[in-house]
């Protein structure tokens, strides 16, 4: 049987396989077949692979040394679909980004400095650039630490991620429809593309409080059908075309915060509710809190830049927004995440 080197890592509130691009075929079709075999795609439990039967654990990060002078490494994210044999490389994944720097250092793609190594990452999916500050005392990656993130038990070393050019990652525009508010099925929404194209929907317009647990929302098939109808219309309006076989745009239900944050959210991936919150989605949501005229601003009257706390089913996530320019195209977003190396070895291919 053929085998390739593989590292399994938790990145933020996601988990997946980290692979070097040199160990995979350049042909996309052949590459995707290998990724599906590794994860066990096409089975609800992903029983024949290392995927966990959930979108949050059926992810792959493909890493290589970058040819772009603005980056040290290239990172291609692959969402391996659980229930069908398909791979989507359209979006970025900010949680998996948390492990890219450590993986790159430990695989010799960039030399470590002490006490912190800044790894410049180019996300191949979106063309965006991210800086990851990895704890490397004495030139060695440190995984243990005191940082805690909601949705993950225990503590670990902090990884600071700064998104340098998040505006219009897939569509070229912050507001791809040229409107701050659009109406689909008579529901007001905001379509925004900051790190991730999302369609933001006030929960009350779908007959929900927005505080329901993910399992309750996932069981409501009528709700999921309404969300998908809005998502498909939003995708076309955002210039993404027919998104029925794409995981973007991601739908987000919003409601007033309950625990002192700026906003409460339920983030969909896109057909099931995230147990916490995607980093890229959090950047889009926080941007909608700061920018005028959005449906979010009808709930959050005034936030501005700085730290924006977003409540989600597992707790909350802080995004720090800064802007040295005059409009949203120059927004920078920073988050603190953690990562853990779970195993390093070889994965066998059927």
Swiss-Prot record:
The keyword Isomerase applies. Belongs to the PrpF family. Its EC number is 5.-.-.-. It comes from the Bacteria. One of its GO terms (molecular function) is isomerase activity. This is Putative isomerase YbhH. Pfam families: PrpF. Keywords: Isomerase. The keyword Secreted does not apply.
């Amino acid at each position: 049987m053929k085998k390739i080197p593989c590292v399994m890592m938790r990145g933020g509130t996601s988990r997946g396989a980290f692979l070097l691009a040199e160990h995979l075929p350049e042909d996309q079709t052949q590459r995707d077949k290998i990724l599906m075999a590794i994860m066990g795609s096409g089975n609800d439990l992903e029983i024949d692979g290392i995927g966990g039967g959930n979108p949050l654990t059926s992810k792959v990060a493909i890493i290589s040394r970058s040819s772009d002078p603005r980056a040290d490494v290239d990172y291609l994210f692959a969402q391996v679909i659980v229930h069908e044999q398909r791979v989507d490389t359209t979006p970025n994944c900010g949680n998996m980004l948390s492990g890219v720097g450590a993986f790159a250092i430990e695989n010799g793609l960039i030399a470590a400095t002490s006490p912190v190594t800044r790894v410049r990452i180019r996300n191949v999916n979106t063309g965006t650039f991210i800086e990851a500050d990895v704890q490397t005392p004495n030139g060695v990656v440190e995984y243990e630490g005191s940082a805690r993130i909601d949705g993950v038990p225990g503590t670990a070393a902090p990884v600071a991620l700064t998104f340098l050019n998040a505006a219009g990652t897939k569509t070229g525009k912050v507001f791809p429809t040229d409107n701050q508010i659009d109406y689909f099925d008579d529901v007001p929404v905001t379509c925004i593309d900051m790190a991730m194209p999302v369609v933001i929907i006030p929960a009350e317009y779908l007959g929900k409080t927005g505080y329901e647990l993910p399992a309750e929302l996932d069981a409501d098939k009528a709700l999921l059908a309404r969300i998908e109808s809005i998502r498909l219309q939003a995708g076309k309006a955002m210039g993404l075309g027919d998104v029925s076989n794409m995981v973007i745009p991601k739908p987000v239900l919003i409601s007033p915060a309950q625990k002192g944050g700026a906003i409460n959210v339920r983030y969909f991936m896109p057909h099931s509710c995230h147990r916490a919150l995607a980093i890229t989605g959090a950047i889009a949501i926080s941007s909608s809190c700061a920018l005028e005229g959005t449906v979010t601003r009808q709930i959050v009257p005034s936030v501005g830049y700085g730290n924006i706390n977003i409540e989600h089913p597992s707790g909350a996530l802080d995004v720090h927004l800064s802007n040295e320019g005059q409009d949203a195209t120059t927004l920078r977003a920073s988050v603190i995440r953690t990562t853990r190396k779970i195993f390093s070895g070889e994965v066998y291919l059927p």
